[in-house]
């Protein structure tokens, strides 16, 4: 028992700054939604639709770069710090290439939005404008993630926390300026949220680079000599590790994003209620997601040290702490769901729908916690392909079809509207949690030699 208590302390020491950083990041979305909602319900719905396309695209790049964290943690644990700088430099090259692709996709996303059935033309125009403003922040966001992954792989999670709050503090006044048109700036409404967020991502990246250049603990990494040219072999390995993570994130996020697109023809009330419930549940999700990042660091570091038993301890401790956190957040969500909805919008119909959907969100929080921490554990073991297969099966084969049938057809019951999709979320996330745990048990029962050989790749 003592080893689990000690490991829990180490995990929380890593996870708490990550939690705070993620809260700051998610709070930026909260601020965008609230401030756009204060301008008009149409602008809030436009931000919701635009975000439903932005998130799958940018999180694909984010997932690709997550391969850096276990790679750096394993190199750090095995005492091979001299190899870290080269990995980071290749991460920046990879981020640059991916950001160009993402920007092209987002620029042309208007075709998707305007092809939605029965979508209001004014709503579509605002959503397209929001995306075309936001896409200029894609390189800044991905470059920031490379720098952050470097710090977190070295078990330094506080810098990401500090930069997250800097971003949040900058986002609020810049939102105000561009949404309402102050200090000589144009009044852009929801599009102003995109302008503000793009600017904030570049501020966060530049602030993180400034920290890394001054950090004494990273002097040996920073001082590596040589020209930062693309290294195809290293980039190929990062892609091999990161692509399954990216696709897994893509499949998970598109479960939510596609639902937002399917809900949009149902009307502004349904879109707004769904967005409020989804935005708040995302705020609660930062707890297990941040703990998963800490577990990845600890598992990768322990495997770098050659200790498979300590890696198991880190994994099990992370799961126990995550379930406890999820239970508390579920109770909080159920108890205060109506008051939470009122923070976003005072339309009675929107508040009623959002409060109802939050009940369903509370149901899946425990299984969601298990599946995301399970994914973090598998990343630590560098077993990323299994994450891809599990998420595809859980979200696209089980979750989304189930939600569609319940929400929009009468094959099982009368069409349930947004609530049917949320039941689909429960089915998908619970299935993912079960499969993640089965895969983890399989890996941990392999001979130590094989586990360490896989981790050192």
From Swiss-Prot:
Subcellular location: Cell inner membrane
Keyword Lipid metabolism (UniProt): no
One record GO biological process: sodium ion transport
Key words, A-Z: Antiport, Cell inner membrane, Cell membrane, Ion transport, Membrane, Sodium, Sodium transport, Transmembrane, Transmembrane helix, Transport
Main location: membrane
Pfam families: MatE (PF01554)
MF term (GO), any: xenobiotic transmembrane transporter activity
Record membrane topology: Multi-pass membrane protein
Domain of life: Bacteria
InterPro entries given in the database record: MATE_fam (IPR002528), MATE_MdtK (IPR050222), MdtK-like (IPR048279), Multidrug-R_MdtK (IPR022913)
Transmembrane region(s): 11-31, 53-73, 93-113, 127-147, 160-180, 189-209, 243-263, 276-296, 314-334, 350-370, 387-407, 418-438
CC terms in the record's Gene Ontology section: plasma membrane
Family: Belongs to the multi antimicrobial extrusion (MATE) (TC 2.A.66.1) family. MdtK subfamily.
Annotated function: Multidrug efflux pump that functions probably as a Na(+)/drug antiporter.
PANTHER family: FMN_FAD EXPORTER YEEO-RELATED (PTHR43298:SF2), MULTIDRUG RESISTANCE PROTEIN NORM-RELATED (PTHR43298)
Protein name: Multidrug resistance protein MdtK
Gene source species: Escherichia coli O139:H28 (strain E24377A / ETEC)
Gene name, Swiss-Prot/TrEMBL: mdtK
């Amino acid at each position: 028992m003592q080893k689990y208590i000690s490991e829990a302390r180490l995990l929380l020491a890593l996870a708490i700054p990550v939690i705070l950083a993620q809260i700051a990041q998610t709070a930026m979305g909260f601020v965008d939604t609230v401030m756009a909602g204060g301008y008009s319900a149409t602008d809030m719905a436009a931000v919701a639709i635009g975000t439903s396309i932005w998130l799958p695209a940018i999180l694909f790049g984010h997932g690709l770069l997550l391969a850096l964290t276990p790679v750096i943690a394993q190199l750090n644990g095995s005492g091979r710090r001299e190899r870290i700088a080269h990995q980071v430099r290749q991460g920046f090259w990879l981020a640059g290439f991916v950001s160009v692709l993402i920007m092209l996709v987002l620029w042309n996303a208007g075709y998707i939005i305007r092809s939605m059935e029965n979508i209001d033309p004014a709503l579509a125009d605002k959503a397209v404008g929001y995306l075309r403003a936001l896409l200029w922040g894609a390189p800044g966001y991905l470059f920031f993630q490379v720098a952050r992954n470097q710090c977190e792989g070295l078990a330094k999670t506080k810098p990401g926390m500090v930069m997250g709050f800097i971003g949040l503090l900058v986002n609020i006044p810049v939102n105000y300026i561009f949404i309402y048109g102050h200090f000589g700036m144009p009044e852009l409404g929801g599009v102003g949220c995109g302008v503000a967020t793009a600017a904030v991502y570049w501020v966060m990246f530049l602030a993180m680079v400034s920290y890394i250049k001054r950090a004494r603990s990273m002097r040996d990494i920073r001082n590596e000599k040589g020209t930062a040219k693309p290294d195809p072999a290293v980039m190929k390995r990062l892609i091999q590790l990161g692509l399954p993570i990216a696709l897994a994130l893509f499949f998970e996020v598109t479960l939510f994003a596609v639902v937002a697109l399917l809900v949009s023809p149902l009307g502004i009330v349904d879109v707004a209620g769904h967005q409020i419930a989804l935005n708040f549940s995302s705020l609660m999700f930062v707890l297990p997601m941040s703990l998963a990042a800490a577990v990845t660091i600890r598992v990768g570091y322990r495997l770098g040290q050659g200790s498979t038993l300590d890696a198991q301890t880190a994994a099990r401790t992370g799961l126990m702490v995550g379930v406890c956190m999820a239970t508390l957040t579920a109770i909080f969500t159920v108890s205060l769901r109506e008051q939470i909805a009122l923070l976003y919008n005072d339309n009675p119909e929107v508040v009623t729908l959002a409060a109802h959907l939050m009940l369903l969100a509370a149901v899946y929080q425990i299984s969601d916690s298990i599946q995301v921490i399970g994914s973090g554990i598998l990343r630590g073991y560098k077993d990323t392909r299994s994450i891809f297969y599990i998420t595809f099966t859980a979200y696209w084969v089980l979750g989304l079809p189930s939600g569609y049938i319940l929400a929009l057809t009468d094959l099982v019951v009368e069409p349930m509207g947004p609530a049917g999709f949320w039941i689909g979320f429960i089915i998908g996330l619970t299935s993912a949690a079960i499969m993640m745990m089965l895969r983890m048990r399989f890996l941990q029962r392999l001979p130590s030699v094989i586990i360490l050989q896989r981790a050192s790749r």
